[in-house]
Amino acid sequence: MPKKFQSENTKSAAARARKAEAKAVADAKRKKETEDAFWQDDDKHVVRKEHRKEEKEKKRLELLERKKESQRLLDEEDSKMKGKPTKPAAPSKVTRAQIEETLCKEEKHKDAPEKPKTHLEIPLEENVNRRVLEEGEVEARTVEDAIAALSIGKELDRHPERRMKAAFTAFEEINMPLLKQENPNMRLSQLKQLLKKEWMKSPENPMNQKYATYNSH
């Protein structure tokens, strides 16, 4: 009998040992699963936290960039107000329509009749302006004086076109105001044509004087 009792105790101890071992294995497995779940949740939390951090940094950089752009535009506007642009402005392009409009305005202004001068604006005595010659200056008060002064010297005889121009200028200064008074409605171009016709047959024209001298001989 004692031997049989001892055998039963040994079997019970072995069964308890196996049961305890199985429990230990099960506990270890549950613990590992719990730890894995914890770390998995923690990883998700870390990822979300890192993502929020990245989004926050991105927004901060965007805000900083907008501030820099606003400051740049403000500085540029201040510079323009002071008359100092930050960079040279590109030359503006002129369209064909603008060119034609400008030419049309100039043509209308040119053809507009000139306002006749009053008796207060016309000088009582015409003075011929000083004519600059090659070797000095002369002053003439009449057309004859201007022609005589410009005709002196062999050097001047080599340039008849200068004497012609001076004589015509003196003729124009005297006769143009008279033509404007007589023809107040004429345009300037018409007055110049009329003056030219008068000049071609005027005795004050050096060419007419030359022919008159030739015919007198």
Curated annotation (Swiss-Prot):
Keywords: Coiled coil, Cytoplasm, Cytoskeleton. Pfam families: Ccdc124. Belongs to the CCDC124 family. It comes from the Eukaryota. One of its GO terms (biological process) is transcription by RNA polymerase II. Residues 1-123 are annotated as: Disordered. Ribosome-binding protein involved in ribosome hibernation: associates with translationally inactive ribosomes and stabilizes the nonrotated conformation of the 80S ribosome, thereby promoting ribosome preservation and storage. One of its GO terms (molecular function) is transcription coactivator activity. This is Coiled-coil domain-containing protein 124-B.
